[in-house]
Curated annotation (Swiss-Prot):
Cited InterPro entries: Bacillithiol_biosynth_BshC (IPR011199), CC_BshC (IPR055399), Rossmann-like_BshC (IPR055398)
Similarity annotation: Belongs to the BshC family.
Protein name per Swiss-Prot or TrEMBL: Putative cysteine ligase BshC
EC number(s) on file: 6.-.-.-
Protein source organism: Halalkalibacterium halodurans (strain ATCC BAA-125 / DSM 18197 / FERM 7344 / JCM 9153 / C-125) (Bacillus halodurans)
Its job: Involved in bacillithiol (BSH) biosynthesis. May catalyze the last step of the pathway, the addition of cysteine to glucosamine malate (GlcN-Mal) to generate BSH.
Gene: bshC
Length: 538
């Protein structure tokens, strides 16, 4: 495996300006990650914050032991008992097969940054992956793309109702059939069967979406000591209770702080990354597996979509009795994260950078500073056949990843075609339209009905000429089908379905080609430069 660096900035203006050290964007954050002393400063600031390390370590250790490949993760959890220890953290929804590749790249960034800062700071730094198990939109996590007859389709586990991922039971038989279809869609290699058996075993151990996600992530990072944490697991709710209590007490302040920061961000030209109603209390209440948004109007708390209201005292009483019924939204989840963990750095994708820019005043209202936000790595992987073809064509990887290969494909085909199909057809249409005009004019003079008929007649003539044009082009394409398929194969890797590979493909597709040591090999290459898009040559 070889890694090259490409310059390919994110499309988001906020993320781009953040990477480029632009003051307009950096002013929305407490720390400037471009400063060489940023992590020393953060470490110093963390000494002033209290954390219940024993309770946190105990809960995390118990959670790791639920999964098959937990040994290295459990060793890392022990470090958290050290009062000097800190964490590098990031998270994602519990996607099937760990979801799109950016999840893997986020975890790789967490591991690499934790190792780097443990050496630099001389204190234990634990890599933690926060699984957003309280998310309830299963349609965002219950499918992966598979390829069939050269076309992509979404392969989904159908869900009849909305439930949070930590409680959404996975039918073992349904999951096994779903998994078999995924592997049948892959090209068979020496790795396919053992990989299938391993993933099938991990799936068999899993009862929920988050279980399956954690089993697979811990297996993939089994040598790296990545610690997993499910924010939707009831066992962690007792730890979270005091933060929920504070957020309920400060609801009005949090609402105002968030609204103020969103307005400032919009005025600075960065739009509104989070759009919600002013009454949103930025908390959810879970009942019978369904999640209801809590609204606050200044007097009472109300469950959105359910005719149920609480006073502040009643809601706090529910929290005391049933902390497992409460969960965070996108605004308060970062606050909960930094309240539970001594966060040295938060690893973020481009979208997260945008929405974290709305949270500075929210953190301050809760008595905290925002942790430093570090962009995750970005990458595109290419197999050897595509590498060889690309070298022959001398195309730009940056251009292909950013824009696809359609322009190059059509240009190449035009160069190979000695027949001026477009020119001849356009000239014929112009000439025939000119010859047809007297008929059309005469018909319109005779009456409305003949006039309409003449227009329809011309439409039929033109459509037949266009039909002939398409058929001639199709015949030419069939003549060069073998070479054109190489363009399609390259684009399938570099811009699948018009998306960045990391936003479309899943890790099993790569492991099927290179084996299940792909992640340790990737980590050994220390690919953690900010603002770089890595080209990974498999």
């Amino acid at each position: 495996m070889i890694v090259e660096e490409l310059k390919l900035l994110p499309s988001s203006k906020a993320a781009k300006d953040y990477l480029n050290n632009q003051n307009d964007m950096l002013s929305f954050f407490d720390y400037n990650i471009h400063q060489p002393t940023v992590f020393q400063q953060r470490l110093s600031d963390l000494q002033e914050q209290p954390y219940d390390r024993d309770a946190l370590s105990k809960a995390l250790l118990s959670y790791q032991k639920r999964f098959a490949f937990h040994d290295k993760a459990a060793q890392q959890v022990e470090k958290l008992k050290d009062p000097r220890s800190v964490v590098v953290i990031g998270g994602q929804q519990a996607g099937l097969l760990t979801g799109p590749l950016y999840t893997i790249y986020k975890a790789v960034t967490i591991v690499l940054l934790a190792r780097e800062q443990e050496r630099a700071l001389g204190v234990p730094v634990v890599p933690v992956f926060w699984i957003a198990g309280e998310d309830h939109d299963l349609d965002e996590i219950n499918a992966v793309p598979i390829e069939k007859n050269g076309r992509w389709r979404s392969h989904r586990i159908e869900e009849k109702r909305k439930r949070i991922a930590s409680e959404a039971g996975l039918n073992k038989e349904t999951l096994a059939k779903w998994l078999a279809t995924v592997f049948r869609s892959l090209p068979e290699t020496e790795h396919t069967l053992p990989l299938y058996e391993r993933v099938k075993t991990l799936a068999g151990r899993s009862n929920t979406y988050t279980d399956f996600f954690a089993e697979l992530l811990l297996y993939l990072f089994r040598d790296e000591g990545l610690v997993v944490f499910d924010s939707g697991d009831p066992s962690f709710r007792t730890l979270e209770k005091s933060c929920f209590h504070m957020l309920i007490q400060k609801t009005k302040n949090v609402q105002g702080a968030f609204a103020h920061q969103v307005k400032k961000l919009e005025q600075a030209g960065y739009g509104r990354p989070i759009i919600t109603e002013e009454t949103n209390a930025h908390l959810f209440y879970v009942e019978e597996g369904s999640r209801y948004r809590i609204d606050y109007t200044g007097e009472n708390y109300e469950l959105n979509g359910k005719n149920q209201t609480f006073s502040r005292e009643e809601l706090l009483e529910h929290l005391t009795l049933h902390p497992e019924r409460f969960s965070n939204n996108v605004v308060t989840r970062p606050v909960m994260q930094d309240a539970l963990f001594p966060v040295l750095a938060f690893v973020a994708g481009p979208g997260e950078i945008s929405y974290w820019a709305t949270l500075k005043r929210v953190f301050h209202e809760c008595g905290m500073k925002m942790s430093p936000v570090v962009p995750r790595i970005s990458a595109t992987c290419v197999p050897s056949a595509v590498q060889k073809w690309f070298a022959e064509k001398q195309y730009s990887y940056e251009e292909a990843i950013a824009h696809g290969l359609e322009k190059e494909k059509e240009g190449w085909l035009e160069e190979q075609t000695p027949w001026p199909i477009d020119q001849v057809v356009e000239e014929a249409i112009t000439q025939i339209r000119h010859s047809h005009k007297p008929i059309k004019d005469l018909a319109e003079q005779i009456g409305e009905t003949p006039g309409k008929l003449a227009n329809k007649n011309w439409s039929i003539i033109e459509s037949q000429l266009r039909f002939m044009e398409r058929r001639m082009k199709r015949h030419v394409r069939e003549r060069f089908e073998h070479e054109l398929s190489k363009f399609d194969e390259a684009e399938r890797w570099l811009k699948p379905n018009g998306l960045l590979q990391e936003r479309h493909d899943h890790v099993i597709q790569l492991l099927n080609i290179v084996g299940d040591d792909f992640i340790p090999r990737l980590i050994s290459m220390n690919i953690n430069k900010m603002g770089v898009h890595y080209l990974v040559k498999l």
